[in-house]
A protein has these predicted regions:
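Buried, small/hydrophobic-residue-enriched core segments of structured protein domains
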Residues: 19-23
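Helix-coil boundary/capping segments in enzymes
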Residues: 16-18, 45
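Phosphate/diphosphate-binding loops
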Residues: 116, 121-134
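His/Asp/Glu-enriched, well-ordered alpha-helical/loop segment
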Residues: 1-9, 26-115
């Protein structure tokens, strides 16, 4: 296919399609079966993992939920959001040893400030860590 090849020469291999309605997203976030996850990559703001223009969610998916939809818009309570990110997600994935803080269970803890947590990554400048994670 000659035409697509000519168009993409020298252009970064990245595409952002905005097809979701923000109103629909708000309703989906509130649904009792909705869990939160991301397909973002493990990246860094410096070194070999700071190349290209990845989707901003690689740096700020969970911070966006906590900052925008919990603190700013009040779509969910903080407790609901954390449960959807942890306990409910583990339950849906049938990870019996994850999702709760309890003796004998595996746990990775993230300490954050609910007053300041904010995603900073953008499509133009995606390599930015979220603020408010201690």
């Amino acid at each position: 296919m000659e035409i697509p090849r000519k168009i993409t020469i020298g252009v970064p291999q990245s595409l952002a399609v905005f097809g979701m309605s923000e109103n629909n997203r708000r309703e989906e976030l509130k649904h009792s079966a909705m869990t939160f996850g991301t397909d973002g990559l493990g990246l860094a703001v410096g070194g070999p993992l700071a190349k290209g223009l990845p989707h901003p969610r690689s740096y700020g998916a969970f911070a966006r939920i906590l900052g925008r939809y919990v603190r700013e818009q009040g779509i969910l309570s903080l407790e609901e959001a954390v449960y959807k990110m942890t306990g409910l997600a583990a339950q849906k994935l049938r990870l019996k040893d994850r999702g709760l803080i309890r003796p004998g269970l595996a746990a990775d803890l993230v300490i954050f400030d609910p007053v300041s947590i904010t995603d900073k990554a953008t499509y133009e400048n995606p390599h930015q860590y979220a603020e408010g994670i201690l």
